[in-house]
Amino acid sequence: MKELMVRENYNLDETIAKDLFEGVTYPWEVLPKIGTFIKELGAELDPEEYEKRGEDVWVAKSAKVFESAYIHGPAIIGKNAEVRHCAFIRGNAIVGEGAVVGNSTELKNVVLFNKVQVPHYNYVGDSVLGYKAHMGAGSITSNVKSDKTLVKVHAPKGDIETGLKKFGAMLGDEV
């Protein structure tokens, strides 16, 4: 299942969350760990570069967050990122450097690597989006199966049990 592994699909130098991926094989393995990781990393961020805006919310001073955007922690908004009009960040969200979270886009339990774009009316939940990944307008990473059972990844050499009830999308770099 090499084609699904973190090291095959993601440049970990393109995320502030590099340490989150230590010791994992598949990208979905980080999903249950995002919130705790943000709280630990946020406490260590340089106050010259990041400001704390509420409970467990850190925003780079160079980031642009529109007044109508809502950010619920834990969350880290990276340098030069944009969180645009009416964006809704529900928590457990890492928004990478230079990333764009657009108009009416909703994020929950995600890692967006640097320069990711989710610019228009997107829902991204329980997902990892690699460096320069882009989701078109209205894209949704529906994250719960209709029968509410645990998600399996169907791979060429057989199914992989994720142990997760919620699972959105794993987009590699430049997808």
Q: Positions of the model-derived regions?
A:
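Flexible, glycine/small-residue-enriched loop-and-beta-strand segment within the central core
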Residues: 42, 69-77, 82-172
